[in-house]
């Protein structure tokens, strides 16, 4: 008989293998030929169908046939891999969820200045869209929708960008170490 070896988390091909498995499962259970957009990575996916497209809820079959946990969200602004998909006047753009960014900043796992410098580079690269007011305005609306927040978060998002775009400003957010 066949000898099946499970994929180990951390293997070089884990992400690609999970992505392929996700796509196969989605292809088997959803009418993707009707979709206007499909993106997937690892075990996450985002699929957009034209308004009014009818299909059977795929979650029960994805759970039993593919052993996948399935959730269908119907927010005004879609999300993929922790990023909102925002439409500005000129394009679509994936922008990190600022609540998750702040949560990461609150972790106490920063080892030293070198580690902080690496975090700074990553934060700066992935959050560069916060320098665009059109994006910030849409992101504020998205945060309100996703977290049922009634207020406006534009000022908070601008403050977040101020601290992310400058290493010196980022350092002021962190407590000073003794010794």
Curated annotation (Swiss-Prot):
The keyword Nucleotidyltransferase applies. It holds the Pfam family RdRP_2. GO terms for molecular function: ATP binding; ATP hydrolysis activity; RNA binding; RNA helicase activity; RNA-directed RNA polymerase activity. Keywords: ATP-binding, Helicase, Hydrolase, Nucleotide-binding, Nucleotidyltransferase, RNA suppression of termination, RNA-directed RNA polymerase, Transferase, Viral RNA replication. It comes from the Viruses. It catalyses: RNA(n) + a ribonucleoside 5'-triphosphate = RNA(n+1) + diphosphate; ATP + H2O = ADP + phosphate + H(+). InterPro entries: DNA/RNA_pol_sf, RNA-dep_RNA_pol_alsuvir. The keyword Hydrolase applies. Belongs to the ssRNA positive-strand viruses RNA-directed RNA polymerase family. Replicase large subunit: is an RNA-dependent RNA polymerase active in viral RNA replication. This is Replicase large subunit. The lineage of its organism: Viruses, Riboviria, Orthornavirae, Kitrinoviricota, Alsuviricetes.
């Amino acid at each position: 008989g066949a000898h099946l070896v499970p994929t180990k988390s951390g293997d070089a091909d884990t992400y690609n293998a999970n992505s392929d498995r996700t796509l196969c499962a989605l292809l088997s259970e959803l009418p993707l030929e009707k979709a206007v957009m499909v993106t997937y990575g690892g075990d996450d996916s985002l699929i957009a169908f034209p308004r009014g497209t009818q299909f059977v809820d795929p979650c029960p079959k994805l759970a039993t046939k593919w052993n996948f946990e399935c959730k269908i969200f119907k927010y005004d602004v879609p999300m993929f891999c922790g990023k909102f998909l925002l439409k500005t006047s000129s394009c679509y753009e994936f922008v990190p969820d600022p609540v998750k960014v702040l949560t990461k900043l609150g972790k106490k796992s920063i080892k030293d200045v070198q580690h902080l410098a690496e975090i700074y580079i990553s934060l700066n690269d992935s959050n560069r869209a916060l320098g665009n007011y059109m994006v910030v305005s849409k992101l504020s609306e998205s945060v309100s929708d996703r977290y049922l927040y009634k207020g406006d978060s534009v000022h908070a998002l601008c403050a977040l960008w101020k601290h992310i775009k400058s290493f010196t400003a980022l350092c002021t957010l962190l407590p000073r170490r003794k010794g």
